[in-house]
Amino acid sequence: MASLYITKNGVSLGLKANRIYISKEGEETKEIPIHKVDRIIIFEGVKISSNLIQYSIENNIEINFLKESGQYLGRVSGGEHDRAEIVRKQVLLTSDENFRVEMSKKIIKSKLSNQITILLRRKKIDESITKNIDLIKRMKVNIENCKSVEEIMGHEGISAKEYFEGISKTINEEFAFDGRSKRPPKDMFNAMISMAYTLLFSEINSIAASKGLYVYAGFMHSDKKGHPALISDFIEEWRSIICDSTVITIINKKCIKKEDFNFNEDGSVYLNKNGRKILVEYMTRKLNSEINYFGKSMTYREALSRQIDSFIEVLKNDDVSLYKVSNTR
């Protein structure tokens, strides 16, 4: 089964004889057997027929909607599990301060370990990033003694600044950037990682919702109307090893160029349709590539699913130690 990404404006999706028909300006360009698709991701400006939406709901094919900028808008799905007991336990525990602190420690320490790994791989390019690595290591140690989620996130914020400074020193000069910028991204690197984070966010959101979790009740990120806070929690430790490493690969291989971006008068920078196509292709490859996750070889997609299973075990047993983090080497 595969995810179907539609990134181009003016494209229409329809359903006929159990096949998805993709057309533009009235002319069919492609058809795909619907049984080969388990998720459809469409960007702003794409039309989708009501019969395809109905079929998707009835057959548990999720449809995700993204803005042209890559911002996640929402999803349509059917057949989600009725797991009221798990949801009650989730809401109860995500309101428990001790649980919130211990889960946040586990995830953010894993996130920092993965950031250190990414920087160590690039240390030979610029030895000066040793100081960035050392500071992140200190923040990781400090987190162990934190008494609140806010304190943990303060250390995470310092680490993020050091991490992105280190990345900027070691990538192609054309893509160098001055820190993390979002809503809107202000340079090509930030445009790419913002889009990559959205693609990963929708992937994790689909997995978590399909397993019956209430995606709006998180333990680390604060509740916001309409925002799946739990997914913002889950994604943290995976950002660097899935998204950032993918973007660095694209830059290193010179697969993307300035012409693949839109530079706007307000200073914002976004991928254009060709740029989105390139990023989607490489993110799909990454998610289908293998990782060693707790002694077993599996794809990143499978690891994401296994990790969410481990979170469900945490809820069932009220035991944070059962959560399997994503540390890589």
Question: Where in the sequence are the language-model features?
Answer:
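Hydrophobic residues embedded in beta-strands of well-ordered beta-sheets
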Residues: 20-21
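Short low-complexity, flexible loop/linker segments enriched in glycine and/or proline
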Residues: 78-81
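Short gly/pro/ser/thr-enriched loop/turn and capping motifs at secondary-structure boundaries
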Residues: 49, 70-75
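Active-site helix-to-loop segments that bind/position phosphate- or nucleotide-bearing substrates
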Residues: 1-16, 25, 31, 73, ...
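Globin-like tetrapyrrole-binding proteins
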Residues: 56
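Extracellular/luminal Protease-associated
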Residues: 34-48
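Short hydrophobic alpha-helical runs that function as membrane-insertion/retention elements
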Residues: 40-43, 61-67
